[in-house]
Amino acid sequence: MLLRRTVGLIVTSGLAAALLAPTTPAVAAVTSGAVFNNPTVASQQYAIVEHVQRLIQGAASGSTIRVAMYHFTLTRVSNDLSAAYDRGVHVRVVVDSQSRSYPAVTGLIAKLGTNRAAASWVTVCTTDRACIGNLNTPIMHNKFFLFSDTLGSTNVLVQSSANLTNDNAERYWNNAVTIVGNTAVYNSYVTYHGDLAAQVKNNDYYRTTSSGTAKSYFFPRAGTTQDTDTIYNMLNENVTCEGNTSTGTETGRTIIRIGMWHFSRNPIATKLRELADQKCWVEVVYTETDTDVRNILSGHDRIKLYQITGDYIVHSKYMLIEGTYDGQKDTKWAVTGSHNYSNAALRENDEALLRIQSATIHDQYRSNFWALRDAAVPVS
């Protein structure tokens, strides 16, 4: 009887202890999807930065974080990378030469060193050049993050339009898309990151990798004509305007939406107007464009232009296609990255672009586009 009573007390007290002990909150899994900041709402300004910080903080010991960043001034992020290094994460960072003297970068260099034979390092691109591009005065304009293992997920890719600066959070509209578990596309970014770090100059670096619902594109791309303009080709070879039944306009016409920092490539504008002539619907929200592009796009019933200027500007670089693409009707696509629709982004700079077929991700971007449009002024 005494033994039975003692066992009962042990079981009861153990259960009570288990019930009273603090529980560890479940770690939210990393999922594919888009994140956007809103510079006009204080609580939403750093949404992209906080997303990246969470992934850095969740990186497993022995895993690898890779970063490629044009402007990097946020010490809150460099501090997280340093802390990750301290707990055994391999941290490899490539930055443009314009970031060389920023405290966030000099602090990382002091912590990680610059020896690429080591497991962790920082590499700064050639002064007044990109890491790969060497035509005219190119820049390493990338903004992406790779996590081999974070928060229980492997092969996590984050492609952003945002630099790691306060202005990119507090003044600029930006986006970031996360793709989880697409090994082929993830590895294409790993290879590109390694090539950026190696700094072998190549003005015709252009490479693509397609797997599942995603495709990566890396620049610079040599050429002088529109048939080597990647965005022009996407529109010219893949977009048709009619025959949709559940997407696009009420009459089944394909809709093309563009949110763009800088738009100056005439062939893209000309193709958009041709598609509008074929009864596609086109909307563009931009910060900067040139006279030729604006004139090409103006004065068409199915093209709507909007500009964001002043204290808050659009820094995103994305295109959304809702309708028929690549012969597939009623599909939804997002094309995003660091790539402005400028000649430098195509021919000179180190840039990355990611095309995704996903109704969920497209609709996330579409909601953001509507927010941009609401914040903009109609041009035509």
Q: What is each model feature region?
A:
Residues 1-28:
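Secretory targeting and sorting signals
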Residues 69-73, 258-264:
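Short, glycine-rich nucleotide/cofactor-binding loops
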Residues 267:
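Active-site-proximal helices and loops of the catalytic beta/alpha 8
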Residues 360-380:
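Amphipathic alpha-helical interface segments
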Residues 29-63, 71-252, 280-281, 285-332, ...:
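HKD-type phospholipase D/PLD-like phosphodiesterase module
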